[in-house]
Amino acid sequence: MQARYSVSSPNSLGVVPYLGGEQSYYRAAAAAAGGGYTAMPAPMSVYSHPAHAEQYPGSMARAYGPYTPQPQPKDMVKPPYSYIALITMAIQNAPDKKITLNGIYQFIMDRFPFYRDNKQGWQNSIRHNLSLNECFVKVPRDDKKPGKGSYWTLDPDSYNMFENGSFLRRRRRFKKKDAVKDKEEKGRLHLQEPPPPQAGRQPAPAPPEQAEGSAPGPQPPPVRIQDIKTENGTCPSPPQPLSPAAALGSGSAATVPKIESPDSSSSSLSSGSSPPGSLPSARPLSLDAAEPAPPPQPAPPPHHSQGFSVDNIMTSLRGSPQGSAAELGSGLLASAAASSRAGIAPPLALGAYSPGQSSLYSSPCSQSSSAGSSGGGGGGGGGGGGSSSAAGTGGAATYHCNLQAMSLYAAGERGGHLQGPAGGAGSAAVDDPLPDYSLPPATSSSSSSLSHGGGGQEASHHPASHQGRLTSWYLNQAGGDLGHLASAAAAAAAAGYPGQQQNFHSVREMFESQRIGLNNSPVNGNSSCQMAFPASQSLYRTSGAFVYDCSKF
């Protein structure tokens, strides 16, 4: 008798029932030697006992292969192809794309060893499939090639019978009448084809309606390829002769133009150090560079106040990611600015989540600097607003922390004269106009002090705050990165209204727990929730919103 008893590895001897000292000794020796049990005549009678033979059937005895029936090799497994697929393979493999029945049998047996057995069963199925399926056509044999048996070939309409050329998946059962019907439809479509290019060109001027409320600009009558390229959701509108920074710097809500073409805004933002007004240098980057530049179309303020619905944002997001994101960036700046001036809360901006605006997540200062670009010029609320934004405008082009810090320190120095005038509303309204990760306008400046120094004093009209939260909680930046920003904010607060320092510290105490829980940086005075409060008492009523806001992230 051969040993029916085996273990999968020498170390797993615990599987074996204990059979007495002598046998366990032999077992251990055999395992150590890596040999089989047949070398030991003594225990053999024990192992070949019928009970053990049943307990450890042959399926477990693979460790000692020679003594067990060999498992089926892989090619003996039935191939996953249907008989239709097998016949199709054989026909397509034949030189003339036609083959006899015997040729089909031979091809299948050569290719798939599984079919070398039980020939009668599967060959019957092959014949059955050949006669039953309309995709296989019998071609009578001509006299040039003597022999017996007709040729089989594929119906020309059935070549796309399998999905993506994979024989594993068939689209549907091929029927001749369906194929004829499809052919007729194709013929009809072919006759009607000349008009469709016209129809394809019609929608090009339509996107102004798609983006709700965007100012429809004059379209040049000949539709060129550049326009059609941008047709997928963004508006291929006439180029604006102003860059976003210069356009937003125009100062009053009524004349803030909607930056429509994504390429104009993205090109001017990406042109790095070009000064705000020098659009001609940035313009060649855009898609429709050849277009003549008509005068800018000022959008009416109502558009901005009701402006950015989710549909609008999503349609513009569908365009080229980089361009539309930049468009959203600048467009939202304008809309937030105007709507905050009109006293309407801008909805939560989805621009920050757009895939193209990777710059938002790439560096701590990028978001606030782009905000600064619009912010600065847009609200001529007191001379201070203008100068802080002048630094911010450069920041938009270069996305640089230094400019951000400069604007902070500048704002700190002029903090005193910024807080007072109602014009502060204007500059504040535009100073931080991206309400990216924050609640609506009530949450004025939980971290606006971190993004713009002036923001602390002017925050009574901020649409919402950002940058501080975004930087430390979204990017998990260490507090040290924000150190100079926060200290500058504190300086701004001190310069603006030293009398409120006690409130400042008490509020900071209130946020201690959130800072511990949410901030990766060590808990220090300059952590992310630090707030520089303006003189208006209205802010303190919304501290509940701040607590919610902090814990939310």
Swiss-Prot record:
Changes seen on gene knockout: Embryos die pre- and perinatally with haemorrhagic hydrocephalus and calvarial defects, beginning at 13.5 dpc. Mutants that survive to later stages exhibit multiple craniofacial and vertebral defects characterized by disorganized rib fusion, absence of chondrocytes proliferation and ossification. Show abnormal cerebellar development with an enlarged fourth ventricle roof plate at 12.5 dpc and a disorganized cerebellar rhombic lip.
Chain ranges for the short sequence motif Nuclear localization signal 1 (NLS 1) as given in the UniProt record: 78-93
Motif (Nuclear localization signal 2 (NLS 2)): 168-176
A cellular component annotation (GO) from this entry: nucleus
Region annotation (Disordered) ranges: 173-326, 356-393, 420-466
Pro residues bias (residue ranges): 193-208, 292-303
Localization: Nucleus
GO biological process: angiogenesis; apoptotic process involved in outflow tract morphogenesis; artery morphogenesis; blood vessel development; blood vessel diameter maintenance; blood vessel remodeling; brain development; camera-type eye development
Bias (Low complexity): 243-254, 262-291, 356-372
Cysteine pairings via disulfide bonds: none
Chain's role: DNA-binding transcriptional factor that plays a role in a broad range of cellular and developmental processes such as eye, bones, cardiovascular, kidney and skin development. Acts either as a transcriptional activator or repressor. Binds to the consensus binding site 5'-[G/C][A/T]AAA[T/C]AA[A/C]-3' in promoter of target genes. Upon DNA-binding, promotes DNA bending. Acts as a transcriptional coactivator. Stimulates Indian hedgehog (Ihh)-induced target gene expression mediated by the transcription factor GLI2, and hence regulates endochondral ossification.
Biased composition (Polar residues): 306-322
Residue ranges with Gly residues bias: 373-393
Organs and tissues of expression: Expressed in glomerular epithelial cells, the podocytes. Expressed in a population of adipo-osteogenic progenitor cells, termed CXCL12-abundant reticular (CAR) cells (at protein level). Expressed in many embryonic tissues, including prechondrogenic mesenchyme, periocular mesenchyme, meninges, endothelial cells and kidney. Detected in adult brain, heart, kidney, adrenal gland, lung and testis, with lower levels in stomach, spleen and thymus. Expressed in endothelial cells. Expressed in the mesenchyme adjacent to the developing cerebellum. Expressed in the sternum and rib cartilage.
GO molecular function, one term: DNA binding
Organism: Mus musculus
Ranges for region Required for transcriptional activation: 1-51, 466-553
Chief subcellular location: nucleus
Residue ranges of DNA binding: 77-168
Modifications made to the protein after synthesis: Phosphorylated. Phosphorylated on Ser-274 in response to epidermal growth factor (EGF) in a ERK1/2 MAPK-dependent signaling pathway; phosphorylation contributes to its protein stability and transcriptional regulatory activity. Sumoylated preferentially with SUMO2 or SUMO3. Desumoylated by SENP2.
Keywords for the protein's UniProt record, in alphabetical order: Activator, Angiogenesis, Developmental protein, DNA-binding, Nucleus, Phosphoprotein, Repressor, Transcription, Transcription regulation, Ubl conjugation
Record text on subunit structure and interactions: Monomer. Interacts with C1QBP. Interacts (via N-terminus) with GLI2 (via C-terminal internal region); this interaction is direct and increases GLI2 DNA-binding and transcriptional activity through a smoothened (SMO)-independent Hedgehog (Hh) signaling pathway. Interacts (via C-terminus domain) with PITX2 (via homeobox domain). Interacts with FLNA and PBX1.
Region annotation (Required for transcriptional inhibition) ranges: 217-366
The protein's name: Forkhead box protein C1
